[in-house]
């Protein structure tokens, strides 16, 4: 099973927030995640981005790949190297 770290949309129409999840890459965008790793609110004034770095490192360590968006958010907000 190939695992991806990607965003899962939540919220109301025109007021989204996102969960950072580990999910099978073949699953639907809003499918059942393997694990919820954090959250991202793009509408908040300070673009709140909170993740569990230990779990992200675990998933990346066992071969999961981060989506382009998640990789960019992590690089922008944290001191974690993302291997693509």
From Swiss-Prot:
Entry keyword Ribonucleoprotein: yes
GO cellular component terms, A-Z: cytoplasm; small ribosomal subunit
InterPro entries in the record: Ribosomal_bS16, Ribosomal_bS16_dom_sf
UniProt-listed Pfam families: Ribosomal_S16
SUPFAM superfamilies: Ribosomal protein S16 (SSF54565)
HAMAP family given in the database record: Ribosomal_bS16
Protein name: Small ribosomal subunit protein bS16
Organism phylogeny: Bacteria, Pseudomonadati, Elusimicrobiota, Endomicrobiia, Endomicrobiales
């Amino acid at each position: 099973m190939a695992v991806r770290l990607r965003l899962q949309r939540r919220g109301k129409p025109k007021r989204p927030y996102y969960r950072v999840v580990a999910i099978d890459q073949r699953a639907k965008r809003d499918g059942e995640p393997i694990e919820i790793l954090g959250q991202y609110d793009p509408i908040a004034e300070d673009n709140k981005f909170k993740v569990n770095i230990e779990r992200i490192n675990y998933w990346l360590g066992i071969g999961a790949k981060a989506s382009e968006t998640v990789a960019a958010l992590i690089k922008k907000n944290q001191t974690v190297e993302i291997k693509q």
